[in-house]
Amino acid sequence: MPKPLIALDADGVLLDLSLGYASVWERAFGVRPAERDPEAYWPFDRWAVERLEDEASRARFRNHFDESFWEAVPAIDGAVDACVRLHDAGFHLVCVSALDAPWQAARLRNLRRHGFPIERVIATGNAGTAVSPKADAIAELSPEAFVDDYLPYFRGLPAQVHTALILRGPNGSPNVGEELRLVRSSHADLAAFADHWLAR
């Protein structure tokens, strides 16, 4: 009998993309940015970095989001342990990430190197549509639960999927408003979700 499945977002749930953002800035410009607001949702607001006005600087920054970056994004504290607990309780874990397809294998290597018990990553891309770019993947997987930290990614998901929102970075968070009705439960982090899910 197949194991019950839980789908997990990567950035903001398993991995700290905001911390990785600071490392990219340092690689691109040679200076590690100071932390401006540890409670900021968006990396640009968390770190004391200037807005890049010219295309050359923007391209220089973007070019450092390369394979070596996607293989080395830091794990969020407690996320590996939360996944191990879910895995040991009999759940099959799949990562569904709004990442461009060329970085899918690098993302899986990143997760495996941290010790996440995850053997599959689905990179959906991030096309701006009325429904979540992850909706088709979630419909195909039909997981018991889907955990994400970005409220718009719950748009258009199958009604039977338990939608769990990670409420990180309250300052400037998009996780507000009427669309909170799309969420079945909310948690401070993945460890708190695991506590909730395993206590049912």
Predicted segments — roles?
Residues 70-71, 79-110, 121-124:
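Substrate-recognition element of Asp-dependent hydrolases with the DxDx(T/V) motif
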Residues 100-145, 151-155:
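Substrate-recognition "cap/lid" segment bordering the active-site pocket of phosphatases
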Residues 1-57:
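Active-site neighborhood of HAD-like aspartate-dependent phosphohydrolases
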Residues 92-94, 118, 144, 163-164:
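Hydrophobic anchor at the start of a short beta-strand
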Residues 45-78, 91:
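Metal-dependent phosphoesterase signature
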Residues 109, 113-124, 178-198:
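Structural recognition of alpha->loop->beta junctions
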Residues 83-87, 139, 158:
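Surface-exposed amphipathic alpha-helices with a cationic face
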Residues 143-185:
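Acidic, Mg2+-coordinating phosphoryl-transfer loop and its flanking beta/alpha structural elements
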